[in-house]
A protein has these predicted regions:
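N-terminal beta-strand motif that seeds the catalytic metal site of vicinal oxygen chelate
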Residues: 1-20, 86-87, 140-205, 258-263
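Hydrophobic, proline/glycine-rich low-complexity stretches
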Residues: 2-19, 27-32, 47-51, 61-62
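Vicinal oxygen chelate
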Residues: 7, 16-24, 82, 88-132, ...
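Short, structured motif recognition centered on aromatic/hydrophobic residues
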Residues: 9-16, 26, 31, 66, ...
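Amphipathic alpha-helical segments
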Residues: 19-33, 103, 203-219
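Short secondary-structure junctions
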Residues: 30-37, 111-114, 216-221, 279-287
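Conserved short beta-strand elements that form part of the metal-binding/catalytic scaffold
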Residues: 32-80, 132-139, 218-255, 295, ...
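Structured core of small recognition/catalytic domains
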Residues: 195-198, 205-277
């Protein structure tokens, strides 16, 4: 099923309790406030993006990487609640990923994991309010492997740090002595985009069916407790798992964490083909977009150019 063309994910909205702490954390990524405003619910909103004057590859009309919504009275979700597992920031190349790792490490940012997924290489973090973050780069598409059913081959293997850091260091002695030209301010120096979203759900079959059958995302891979879905042959734009949330608690309005994420269509024909598939019970309109609510109460905005 190849329903869509010209589609992109846009930065998630995170409902945060301590705005100052969260803002300071993400500024270490090189993100800066690009717009401040009051949301429809009266909460202060800050859109964060890269400085187009210092980040080659960033464009002035790029959507924000992330939006923080301040709600000091938000409740903290249970570890078994549905919601955000991580949002994933895609760097343009391997050198950018290596430079971002060194830059963030020099600023004291703590990493919680590293992985080689065959199709990509990844760094994992958690922000001060335990929102998961993946920073990754893709391997060239010609290196991706598919089975006879068109499912992409992915795995979770140890990341080869020596190979990754060799993108920055001229030799092993420099690596040992940490003689890198990378400075603290050089995270995401060539820009980045949102590559995918990974959600915690309570019923994998129901959520997979929702995104696959109702929204038309292609099922690219399954593994115990997880599904990976995509559009246009990418390895995954959306991942779902029940590793800690199986038969757990649906997302509740007013909880900290993921407020919503956005799928942006630049092709009106694809957008129009999608709308009749969506159950009216899961859909409502908002200013300039349509909000779809999945079986766990997670909200996804659907936006189209010229809407």
């Amino acid at each position: 099923m190849q329903m869509y063309s010209q589609i992109r994910l846009e930065g998630p909205i995170l409902r945060v309790i301590d705005l100052d702490v969260e803002l300071a954390y993400y500024q270490k990524f090189g993100l800066i406030p690009i717009r401040r405003f009051l949301g429809e619910n009266g909460h202060e909103m800050i859109e964060l993006g890269f400085d187009v004057n210092t980040t080659p590859g960033s464009q002035s009309d790029n959507p924000p990487i992330l939006t923080l919504m301040h709600d000091s009275s938000a409740s903290r979700p249970s570890h078994r609640s549905a919601g955000l597992f991580h949002f994933a920031i895609l760097t343009p190349d391997r050198e950018s990923l290596a430079a971002t790792f060194v830059s963030l490490e020099k600023q004291g940012i703590q990493f919680v994991g590293f992985a080689d997924h065959l199709v990509s290489e990844s760094l994992y973090l958690q922000d001060p309010e335990n929102n998961g973050i993946e920073i990754y780069c893709d391997r060239p598409r010609e290196l991706w492997q598919f089975d006879e059913y068109g499912h992409v081959q992915m795995d979770t293997l140890a990341l080869n740090f020596q190979s990754l850091l060799s993108e920055l260091y001229s030799n092993n002695d420099d690596m040992i002595m940490n003689e890198s030209p990378i400075k603290e301010s050089m995270a995401f120096l060539r820009g980045a985009i949102i590559g995918h979203m990974h959600l915690k759900v309570t019923n994998l079959a129901a959520s997979t069916d929702f995104y696959h059958e109702m929204l038309g995302f292609d099922l690219m891979q399954t593994m115990p407790g997880a599904s990976f879905l995509s559009i246009e042959g990418y390895h995954h734009r959306l991942a779902l798992n029940t590793w800690r949330s199986r038969a757990g608690i649906s997302h509740k309005e007013g909880e900290s964490g993921l407020e919503q994420f956005t799928v942006h269509f630049t092709d009106r024909a694809s957008y129009k083909r999608l709308l009749p598939r969506i159950s009216k019970s899961s859909l409502h309109t908002a200013i300039n977009n349509i909000i779809v609510t999945d079986p766990d109460g997670i909200k996804m905005a659907l936006v189209c150019d010229g809407q």
